[in-house]
Each structure stands twice: as C-alpha cells, then as structure tokens.
From Swiss-Prot:
Organism field: Homo sapiens (Human)
Outcome following mutation: residue 196 to A: Loss of interaction with influenza virus A PB2
Modified residues (Phosphoserine): 17, 158, 204
GO MF, one annotated term: RNA binding
Protein name (Swiss-Prot/TrEMBL): Acidic leucine-rich nuclear phosphoprotein 32 family member A
Pfam families (alphabetical): LRR_9
Family of the protein in this entry: Belongs to the ANP32 family.
Function: Multifunctional protein that is involved in the regulation of many processes including tumor suppression, apoptosis, cell cycle progression or transcription. Promotes apoptosis by favouring the activation of caspase-9/CASP9 and allowing apoptosome formation. In addition, plays a role in the modulation of histone acetylation and transcription as part of the INHAT (inhibitor of histone acetyltransferases) complex. Inhibits the histone-acetyltranferase activity of EP300/CREBBP (CREB-binding protein) and EP300/CREBBP-associated factor by histone masking. (Microbial infection) Plays an essential role in influenza A, B and C viral genome replication. Mechanistically, mediates the assembly of the viral replicase asymmetric dimers composed of PB1, PB2 and PA via its N-terminal region. Also plays an essential role in foamy virus mRNA export from the nucleus.
Gene name of the encoded protein: ANP32A
Record-listed Phosphothreonine modification sites: 15
GO cellular component entries: cytoplasm; endoplasmic reticulum; nucleoplasm; nucleus; perinuclear region of cytoplasm
Stated consequence of mutating residue 204 to A: Complete loss of phosphorylation
Length: 249
C-alpha cells in the first residue's frame, strides 16, 4: 500500500491536527521519500516508518511536538541534519538497519538537545573501534545507545515503550467503544427480527384457526344436512302408511 493511501486510512475521519501517533510501517514510499505528511500534523508525537524503502528524510515536515521517530529497516545513509530543524524536541530516534557507516553521519544529531535514546543496531557504524564510547562523546546529551547507558545498564522498558503503550491504550479504549456501539446496533436489529418473526407466527396461527373454524363449519353444515335428510325420510315413512290407508278406503 502506498504511503499516502496508508495515511488516509490511519486518519479514520480525523483531521491531521488530531493525530498524536502515526504508524506507516511496511507501506511504500515514493522514490524513497516521505509522502503524504504535512505541517498539519502539528500535534504528532510518535511517527513510525519502519521498512518503507526510505533513502532520504529531506522532505520531513515541521513536527515541533514529535518525540519519537522510528526509521529502522530503511536505506537512509545521511541527511540527518534535517531532524534538528524539523523535529527539535525529538527524544527517541531509531535508525537501526540503515546505511549509517561512520560517526560523521550522525554528528548532526548533536543539535538535538533533547535526544535521550538512539538505536543504531545493524548499521555498519557499530563495527567501528570504540563505537559506544565515541558516540557518547559525540552526543553527550544521550542517555541510552542501543538500549544501554554509558555504564552498560539496560534502559527500563517503561522509558522506551511506556509512551507508545499509553497511546495504544487510548486507541484500544476508542476501538472498544466503537465495538460496543456496533454490537448494540446488531442486538437491536436481532430484537427487531425476532419481533417480526413473532408477529408472523401470530398471524399464521390466526389463519390456521380461521381455517379450522371454516372446516368445523363445513362439518356442522354436513351434519345439519344429514339430520335434515333423516327427518324428511321419517316424515315420508309416516305418510306412506296413511297413503296406503286411503287406498284401502
């Protein structure tokens, strides 16, 4: 799916200014560049573009409130100076799996004064001698590099993931509310169907009763006819002896 189309779907009838988290993982970028993102996403705090084929972030829009940026598994090899200009409040940056080969490539990150965590897993720069020591010297504002601090203490999960989980919880609550509303609509429709079926059964019952009544009426008529026939025959038998007596006279 193209990145522009993915952004449209992620909006879910919201305006860009309402969005705080945007996940575009595995979508397709146009010619290796970001597309569909504009300055209108002024409240955006978390952006994830994992494995979208990026080679450049030059057209990244102004995102003053962006705190966490996921760029892993792309083909970015430089141009990181744009981050300090467009995302001055960035605290977490993941460049794992990109084509970062030397320290000079990440030097522009010095201008990100609030940068607290940087990930460079599976980048060639990690193979350099004294890699960790040199990165911490180059970027003194960093607290965590590849998930560990200067003393090789692992970053707490709450620091790395807590912010995103908080956003996920909010979205889950919204989804649950939407689900509950949809479920209620379905229940109401089922109740209506049951009522209609009940009415149909009542009508069918009345029709059957009418038919039975009609049939009973036919039987009664037949019985009346039989009784009437017997009376006529009886009267005829009475008349016959009388007729015979008259003949004798």
């Amino acid at each position: 799916m193209e990145m522009g189309r993915r952004i449209h779907l992620e909006l879910r009838n919201r305006t860009p200014s309402d969005v705080k988290e945007l996940v575009l993982d595995n979508s397709r970028s146009n010619e290796g560049k970001l597309e569909g993102l504009t300055d209108e996403f002024e409240e955006l705090e978390f952006l994830s573009t994992i494995n979208v084929g990026l080679t450049s972030i030059a057209n990244l829009p102004k995102l003053n409130k962006l705190k966490k940026l996921e760029l892993s598994d792309n083909r970015v090899s430089g141009g990181l100076e744009v981050l300090a200009e467009k995302c001055p409040n960035l605290t977490h940056l993941n460049l794992s799996g990109n084509k970062i080969k030397d320290l000079s490539t990440i030097e522009p990150l010095k201008k990100l004064e609030n940068l607290k965590s940087l990930d460079l897993f599976n980048c060639e720069v990690t193979n350099l001698n004294d890699y960790r020591e040199n990165v911490f010297k180059l970027l003194p504002q960093l607290t965590y590099l590849d998930g560990y601090d200067r003393d090789d203490k692992e970053a707490p999960d709450s620091d790395a993931e807590g912010y995103v989980e908080g956003l996920d919880d909010e979205e889950e609550d919204e989804d649950e509310e939407e689900y509950d509303e949809d479920a209620q609509v379905v229940e109401d429709e089922e109740d209506e169907d049951e009522e209609e079926e009940g009415e149909e059964e009542d009508v069918s019952g009345e029709e059957e009763e009418d038919e039975e009544g009609y049939n009973d009426g036919e039987v009664d008529d037949e019985e009346d006819e039989e009784e009437l026939g017997e009376e006529e025959r009886g009267q005829k038998r009475k008349r016959e002896p009388e007729d015979e007596g008259e003949d004798d006279d």
